[in-house]
């Protein structure tokens, strides 16, 4: 993996972000999210910004490492690959050296569990302005994300795909 080639530094998206110091090829694992796994009822701080949902009621907490700083983008260059209670960040395409690594936070979140939303600051051409649970993304984007295998099975299930209110 690429852990030794990642640095945390100031970001235009969030206060800090994860950047690569080398070119990263397409479709490869970059790093694993390594925090403690919690059930929804065990979360020490349910509002911590570094929580990552990895199952309907399962979360990975902050690790104190680079994975705590990966920012959101509505046009991401990475995806979060979730298998069981493990989450690994993969490149979606070739990522040039010096680039910030991002993934779409909505691809791992179901609003039924964490009931959160936040203002988006990615400034991409695809910016949705608000980040929230997967079911609130427009249906065309939901289908694209599912087709490209960008969402874990607990989210891709047809009963979770709903139109926005």
Stretch-by-stretch model annotation:
Residues 74, 79-165:
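C-terminal SET catalytic tail plus cysteine-rich post-SET Zn-binding segment of SAM-dependent SET-domain
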Residues 1-83:
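Catalytic cores of histone-lysine modification enzymes
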